[in-house]
């Protein structure tokens, strides 16, 4: 989708590249350096024309109790299906005509739903009829309701009671997605007598075991914690299992739960069990998992025609070509100019997220951070706080890239490039959600990474090239370097972030695109505030060459 034209008076500097822009994008004279580091950053921010937000503002915000937040923030967004979907012959898009039970219909009405999305309309009828389903759908398509509604109806029709134990298990890759699914399940089961629960890593295991012993009819779980309870919780009754849902199967396998899933499938009873497996992509590993979990002859449902683009219609997508040493300067400028927007910034490693969030908060640009090394309570609080915010910035790893329904996100910034087109699609899927959703995305690429665009084109992802004119980018490099040099804690955090960035870069699967040998380590170091890159020993490639040796070679080449 082509980017909208912008006037000079608009505050967002993002626009489509033109030859005239490129010719005129020379640096303007920088203001005289200011003595104190904090004052330096404040003046640059002032030159950008945006007031600095109170750094304590977010800490002072009153937070709701967990129960209230679960009810409010996990509620699915209501949107009508398009006419093209509703007019498809032979497909029922009406919840009223789907023959749901009275308690379920009452909950659906209270949640505000009237028409099904395409994936719901295609998937719910065969699931209600007891078929096993292997489903593929674009992110944000309403898949959660597509498997939850038949699961709730199954519990109702069998008149399952808490003493019968767990009859439905839903497995999902991340804790945040599990929390979201659990919240929706609770709303759907509001007028049912059956019980629902959740078990996730990082939560109180003893508390979970107590609830399981009392009887949880519908259980939402992450793989590792579920396997733990299956093996070690004596009061966990699961012999009456009637339905198994595996959501985001490709992601579950990508993050290393292949062995756990095989063990779970082996432990769970499979007699008369209905299985629903959803995956955005059909990899060999997903096919293997489907083979051992689904009954013979499952129904395959794909609601994404190959000719369609892989991302949402309301999403404007672009990329910017930027040398490594200018990456943070560009990010800082962009965030300051869009301080009133709701933005997610994706990075490739936990320590990089930690450093940049600490840095941005220190220079009075308030951000939240979310990554896999945080304690579960911190992750949950951060997730709900950002969901509830009308504006704000979330710096995160790909832990937030899949399935999460975060309301009204304006921008997705891929500061570190995604591993492959699937990761790109799931990252940008956090905005422009629902039928009428709108949003924008911007991906940072260095000149050596432009080959990734070929892969996106092959995956039917339309992108425009954008440019930030150089005179619109705040040159805070000297202030950044001074800050990292004088602040011990930030210096250590920057060093950890730098090392983690290189480790993540060397682990990319697209080796022809992300070639760590082509990285200019001096420029990479500058984006972390170092004049001279710190010494790190990371072995790269089959040759066993280390990052430190590569840095010495680059220094020799410059002499």
From Swiss-Prot:
Intervals of motif DEAD box: 247-250
GO:BP terms for this protein? maturation of LSU-rRNA from tricistronic rRNA transcript (SSU-rRNA, 5.8S rRNA, LSU-rRNA); maturation of SSU-rRNA from tricistronic rRNA transcript (SSU-rRNA, 5.8S rRNA, LSU-rRNA); snoRNA release from pre-rRNA
Is the keyword Nucleotide-binding in the record? yes
**Basic and acidic residues: which segments have biased composition?**
9-22, 55-75
- Region named Disordered: 1-90
Q: Identify one Gene Ontology CC term for this UniProt entry.
A: nucleolus
Query: What superkingdom heads the lineage?
Result: Eukaryota
Question: What is its biological role?
Answer: ATP-dependent RNA helicase involved in 40S ribosomal subunit biogenesis. Required for the processing and cleavage of 35S pre-rRNA at sites A0, A1, and A2, leading to mature 18S rRNA.
Q: Which family does it belong to?
A: Belongs to the DEAD box helicase family. DDX18/HAS1 subfamily.
According to its record, what is known about the domains?
The Q motif is unique to and characteristic of the DEAD box family of RNA helicases and controls ATP binding and hydrolysis.
Q: What protein does this entry describe?
A: ATP-dependent RNA helicase HAS1
């Amino acid at each position: 989708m082509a980017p909208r034209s912008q006037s000079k008076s608009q505050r967002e500097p993002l626009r489509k590249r033109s030859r005239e822009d490129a010719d005129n994008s020379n640096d303007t004279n920088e203001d005289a350096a200011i003595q104190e580091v904090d004052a330096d950053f404040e003046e640059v921010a002032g030159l950008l024309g945006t007031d600095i937000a109170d750094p304590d503002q977010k800490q002072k915000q009153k937070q709701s109790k967990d129960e209230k937040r679960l009810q409010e923030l996990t509620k699915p967004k209501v949107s009508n299906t398009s006419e093209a979907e509703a007019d498809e012959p032979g497909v029922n898009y009406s919840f009223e005509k789907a023959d749901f039970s009275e308690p379920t219909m009452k909950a659906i009405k209270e949640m505000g739903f009237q028409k099904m999305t395409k994936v719901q309309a295609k998937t719910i009828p065969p699931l209600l009829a007891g078929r096993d389903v292997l489903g593929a759908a674009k992110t944000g398509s309403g898949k959660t309701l597509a498997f939850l509604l038949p699961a709730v109806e199954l519990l109702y029709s069998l008149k399952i009671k808490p003493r019968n134990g767990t009859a439905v298990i839903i497995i999902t890759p991340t804790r945040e997605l599990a929390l979201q699914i659990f919240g929706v399940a609770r709303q759907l089961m509001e007028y049912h007598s059956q019980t629902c629960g959740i078990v996730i890593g990082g939560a109180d295991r003893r508390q979970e075991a107590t609830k399981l012993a009392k009887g949880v009819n519908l259980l939402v779980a992450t793989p590792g914690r579920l396997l733990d309870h299956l093996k070690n919780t004596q009061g966990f009754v699961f012999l009456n299992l009637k339905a198994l849902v595996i959501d985001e199967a490709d992601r579950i396998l990508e993050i290393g739960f292949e062995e756990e899933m095989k063990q779970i499938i082996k432990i769970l009873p499979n007699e008369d069990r209905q299985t629903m497996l959803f995956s955005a992509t059909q990899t060999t590993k997903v096919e293997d998992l489907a083979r051992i979990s689904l009954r013979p002859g499952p129904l395959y449902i794909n609601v994404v025609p190959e000719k369609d683009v892989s991302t949402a219609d309301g999403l404007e997508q672009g990329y910017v070509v930027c040398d490594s040493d200018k990456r943070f300067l560009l990010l800082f400028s962009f965030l300051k100019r869009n301080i009133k927007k709701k933005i997610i910034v994706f990075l490739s490693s936990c320590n990089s997220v930690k450093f940049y969030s600490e840095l941005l908060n220190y220079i009075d640009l308030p951000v939240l951070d979310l990554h896999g090394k945080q304690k579960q309570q911190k992750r949950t609080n951060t997730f709900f706080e950002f969901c509830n915010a009308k504006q704000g910035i979330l710096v995160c790893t790909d832990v937030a890239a899949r399935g999460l329904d975060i309301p009204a996100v304006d921008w997705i910034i891929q500061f570190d490039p995604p591993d492959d087109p699937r990761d790109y699609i799931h990252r940008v899927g956090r905005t422009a959600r629902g039928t009428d959703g709108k949003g924008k995305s911007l991906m940072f690429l260095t000149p050596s990474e432009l080959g990734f665009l070929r892969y996106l084109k092959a995956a039917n992802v339309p992108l425009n090239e954008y440019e930030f004119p150089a005179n619109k980018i705040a040159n805070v490099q000297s202030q950044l370097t001074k800050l990292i040099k004088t602040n011990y804690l930030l210096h250590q955090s920057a060093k950890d972030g730098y090392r983690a960035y290189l480790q993540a870069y060397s682990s990319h699967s697209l080796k022809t695109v992300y070639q760590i040998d082509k990285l200019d380590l001096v420029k990479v170091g500058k984006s972390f505030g170092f004049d001279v890159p710190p010494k790190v020993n990371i072995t790269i490639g089959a040759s066993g060459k280390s990052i430190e040796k590569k840095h010495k070679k680059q220094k020799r080449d410059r002499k």
